[in-house]
Structure formats: C-alpha cells, structure tokens
Amino acid sequence: MMHAVTRKDSIQKLTVLNTKSETPFIPYQGKIIRRITTNELGFSKTLQDTSSRIRYVGTRIVNVLHRNTRGWVIKNHLFFRENTVLNAYILADNERYLRSLDFIRDARIVVRRVGNTDSVDVEVVTKDLFTITGALKVKGVKGIGARGAEANFLGMGQRIQITTLLDRNRQPAFGYEFLYSKSSLGKSLATITVGYTVVNSGISTGMEEEKALYFRIFRPLVSPYSRLAGGLEISFNSSQNYFRKPEPDFYRYAYDLVDVWAGYNLGVTKLLQKGAIRDRSFLALRLLHNDFTHLPEQVAGNFDPVYNSKKAVLAEFTLFRQDFYKSNYIYGFGTTEDIPSGYNLAITTGWFKQLQLQRPYAGFNANHFVTSKRGELAQYFVRAGGFWNNGKMQDASLLVGGNMFSKLYLLNTLKLRANVRFSYTRTFNRITSEPLRINNPFGLRSFRADSAQGIQRISMYTESFVLTTYRVLGFQLAPFGFTDFSLLSPNQEKIYKQNLYSGFGGGVRTRNENLIFGTLELRFIYFPKTPETFRAFKIAFKSNLRFRYNSRYVKAPDIIQLNSDETLQY
C-alpha cells in the first residue's frame, strides 16, 4: 500500500502525493453537505498552489481564446448533492471521474468544516485543458487536409469537429467530416456523439476509404456505487473508390452496425449503506448486429474476420474491487494520475454467428492490479476463451501477461522510471478468427508489416524514460530508450526454435499538459530482422498519443481480443 498523508483539511496546498484517493475525505465521512461550489482555474494558476500566478505571453493568449468550463457543467458531472450525507469514497470516485473528462486537465474536491456543526461545504476545483486544436496534413503538391476542433465549445462540455480534404487524385477532390459530441447530457453522465464523414474517419472496419453516418451514446460505470452503465452505436458505412483503384483491387462493400449493451451493479443499494465495502458484482448484456449488405467479391462466401456479417448475444458477469491511488509521472508529465489497486474478473458467455456458422462462446478475463509502498505498479492478466462446435473447441485462445513500472527515482531535477511488459499468446483450432500478428501492442512497436503471422507468440518490451524540467514553449521533454522482442510460431513447433523479431532504439516524448491533444513522440528504431519490403531503420512520429492508466471498472461484453488491447499503451 502507498503511504497516506495527514491533513488539517481535505487538502492544504492541493499537492499530488502517492496516497489513497479517499484519504483526504475520511475525516468528513457522515457529515452533511451544506453547499457545493465550483472554482474553475484559468491557465495562470496551478492546482498545486492557487495563490501563485503563471505569467508569460502564451498564458495570456490562451486565457483570451479559452472559455472556462461553466460551473453548471461541472455540477452536471457530479454524483453527490447538497443536503445529503458525505461518502468519502463517492467523493474520491467523482474527483477521479472529473479528471477523465476530455476537457479537464486536473480536478480536486475540497471539503471544509462549517464551524462546530456537523455540516461541511464542498468546493470542486478544476483546471481546464486548452481545447482548441487543429491539424494540417500536406500530401505533396496535389493534396492538403485540415482539421479543426473545439472540445469544450462555449465551456459547455460539447465538442465540435470539422475536417476538410482537398486532393487532386481524389474524385470528388473535396471531402469533409462533421462531428458533434455532448458530455453528460441532461445530467445523465452519458456522452452522445453524432457524425458524418466521407474522409474515412468513421468506424472503418475494412481497408478501403469509407463513408459513414454514425450515432453513439455511452455511459460508464463512474463509481462502484453507481447503478447503471451501457452504450449504443448505430452506423451506416460503405467503401468508396475515391482514388479510382482498378476494380479487381478495390474491395466494394457496405455494412450496417447496431451494437447495444447495458449492465446493472448488483446489490448497490445495500452496499451504499456499508460504504467501506468495495467488492462489487456487475451483470451486463450485449446485442451485436454487424450486417454486410454488400460483400466484396474477393471474399464472397468465405470466412473472413473482417468482411463477414456477425451477430452476437453476450452476457458478462464481473466481480471487481478497485481502489485508487493518486500519483504522477507514470504516463503523464506531472498531472494527477489515478492508479488502480485490486482485481477484476469478467466471465463471458453467449451465442455468436458468423456467416452461417453458429456457436456458443465462453471466456474469462482476469486482472490483478498491484501497488507497493515503494511506488512500484503492476498489472497482471490472464485471458482465455473459445467456441464450442461439433463436440470440440474452435478458435480457442489463451493470453497471459503483465505490465510493470518501477518506482520513481529522483536524480537532482530528473525523474526516472522503468517499464517492462510481457505476454504469451496461444491459439487452438483456428477456424474464423484472425491469426496472431506482431504489429500491435502484443508485438513490436512501429512494426507495421502484417505478413508475420502465427498461432503462438511471446513478446517482451522494456523501456527506461527520464522526465526533465526543461520546457520549450510549455512542452516538457522526456527522452527514452527501449528494447522490443517477439517470437512468433506459425505451426506446432517449439516457439523457442522460431526466428526472433526485435527492435532497438530511443526517442523523445513531449507534451504541454495545458493542451488537449496528447503526447507527441519521436522514435528512432532499428529492426535487425525484417521482411524484404520493410526497411531496417525507421523514424516514427506519432501525435495525440493518449497515455493513461486504464481505470475502467467494466466494459461491454466481448470475446477475447488477441491483436489489440485498450489496457496496454501502444
């Protein structure tokens, strides 16, 4: 367990420490909340010391351009109310939830006593991200694309995004996208999104340019004391031959998607009366209908993991206990990060249809999150699943692995940390599922060739990074070095006899924590062994990387994914 802290009030100087999230609120457990106020900081103040001011030209400019989140918008994202009993765990969960919002950089909830009464006042202090973003992409002399977005338009928790494209090789030459999103619509804590695109920025199931009209709504389980979670996605998609590929090479297809799920936190009313108990159970049901109304001729009626119609009814029972610690300098550059500690076990069963093949499915996903007194962090996981057909298992899989961080080392003004990730994957009797590949989070970073495929995979990634105090225009620099290894077996032979794929190199990451777009990364890589068409040396630049420790309690029921993973950063 990480060390806790003792305070006279719920916070003194808003300092981020390695402490349990609920610790500042425990002294006020059971008090009556008299009043709730909000305090939206500008870019000239910090959460660590609200009395000091940051004064430079950039701060003045963004303060002029930016509209702070309105107080009523912040209150729409709260799940505690005035004239109710204070629950320390709910306040801690709410503070963490506020930090997860796209337009909030950091948040603190401050509790203050009201004289000698049994009442308290609660102040919600937030610091926004600068949410106006833009991007420009030049494609030689014949093409140019631009994207502009405001993720907190008018300070009302709504996102407006417009993308345009002009390319002489494209017919028509002009393309566009429009997206609108609203957070916690009607105090529901649900986010709605609607969009239309002709520039391949939708779901894009296939490999061609796609046109799409889509609608999404998502409500997370914001706290172990919350009752409901769920989501809905409806989209209409079709491939478009904008760049006039020859017909034999172009995959012409169209598909409609309806994906809905909902879940209920079992026994939450009883557990609310016993606030310290954090063990929970959650039951969810998902209905999936992905219908290809037009199939590409290249696939016809053959099994294909991408271009087949799919229907599924999946139920998932989740047992979990996740407490959180407030820490920093893990994935971020100093802003508060919420680190889970505990377990999460999800058991999934249901029915799945692909083309005319109908099969029952069963699987499980077990995760253990560990923190130590020294500040070390780890996530260990075991995932397995498969289909039953004709008296035997089909498309069965096993995936085990871990993701570990060392404690934070201080060397003068430098902060150093190491990260190790490893995984082992095995598939059995593959019929319709994708083969294992290494161009994903369970393989080699920036290795884009998809010709390396197999049924068994072992991977390990190690990285050491240094966080400096040096800034350029508000962007903090973090150099890193890494090694990457993968063994991939295409058959039943022993995996240690297979060819070793590896990558070595280093680079630098940078981020301005006041801006909404994510981390920028420049990576230099050497691959000793590559396919013939793949260069051994590579320079990779990525923008808008979202490095954040996974902290979701539950998700939509799903089959085990072997070539992608939202809980591992990539």
Regions found by a protein language model. Name each.
Residues 1-391, 404-570:
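Immediate N-terminus of the mature polypeptide
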